């Protein structure tokens, strides 16, 4: 994996993020073939949950790379670091890889996918309960604290990286997504409201980090 992945950095001097085809532990289910930014401003793993049938065998540019097995160019990390840190300590869990990718894109860096570099990832092995490992619909298996982190970190990522133009362009999609999400919270996960309110203190810091 390492040998193949590192070849990506010699293709273009502005490639700062490289990863390969990430499979689940069953070695046939795709976990990620590149990280992308969705219209509703969530992290989108290309190929997530699909069976590997050779549909992602073409290497090429991607928005970012999954943090499970990511290679980052040191020059890129040095250029995009915030307050001396590469990763935002306020995130705790989730969205760090999208935050890094979005920051890197704003600075003119690129991500690259190499399908010959194959790795295996136990999805949820760190954050989920044992019954949720390698299962879809991650939110179901998260503790309340981690679920709150997931929601909070999406907002922090948007605040830090979205341009004014991008905000208004994607506002309808984001508003629709948030309407559904908050409806779910109010109906089924009301216990998330308190930790989410406690997390609002991080918003001020995020606004200060806007590029």
Q: What do the PLM-derived regions correspond to, one by one?
A:
Residues 29, 42, 50-75, 86, ...:
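A recurrent flexible, glycine/aromatic-enriched loop bordering the glycosyltransferase active site
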Residues 98-160:
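Catalytic donor/gating beta->alpha subdomain of glycosyltransferases that bind UDP-sugars
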Residues 17-19, 113-114, 169-170:
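A structural signal for short, well-ordered beta-strand segments and their strand-loop junctions
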Residues 4-5, 99-103, 153, 178, ...:
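Alpha-helical elements of Rossmann-like donor-binding domains used by nucleotide-donor carbohydrate transfer enzymes
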Residues 163-211:
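Non-catalytic, C-terminal membrane-associated alpha-helical segments of glycosyltransferases
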């Amino acid at each position: 994996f390492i040998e193949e992945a590192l070849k990506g950095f010699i293709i273009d001097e502005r490639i700062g993020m490289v990863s390969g085809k990430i499979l689940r532990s069953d070695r046939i289910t795709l976990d990620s073939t590149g990280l992308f930014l969705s219209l509703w401003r969530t992290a989108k793993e290309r190929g997530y949950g699909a069976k590997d049938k050779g549909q992602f065998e073409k290497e090429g540019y991607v928005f970012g790379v999954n943090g499970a097995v990511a290679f980052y160019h040191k020059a890129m990390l040095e250029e995009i670091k915030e307050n001396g840190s590469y990763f935002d300590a306020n995130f705790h869990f989730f969205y760090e890889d999208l935050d890094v990718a979005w920051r890197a894109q704003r600075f003119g860096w690129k991500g690259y996918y190499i399908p010959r570099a194959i790795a295996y990832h136990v999805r949820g092995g760190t954050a989920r309960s044992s019954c949720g490992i390698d299962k879809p619909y991650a939110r179901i298996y998260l503790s309340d604290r981690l679920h709150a982190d997931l929601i909070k970190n999406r907002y922090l990522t948007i605040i830090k990286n979205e341009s004014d133009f991008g905000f208004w362009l994607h506002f309808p999609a984001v508003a629709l997504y948030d309407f559904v999400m908050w409806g779910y919270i109010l109906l089924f996960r009301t216990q998330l409201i308190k930790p989410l309110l406690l997390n609002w203190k991080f918003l001020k810091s995020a606004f200060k980090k806007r590029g």
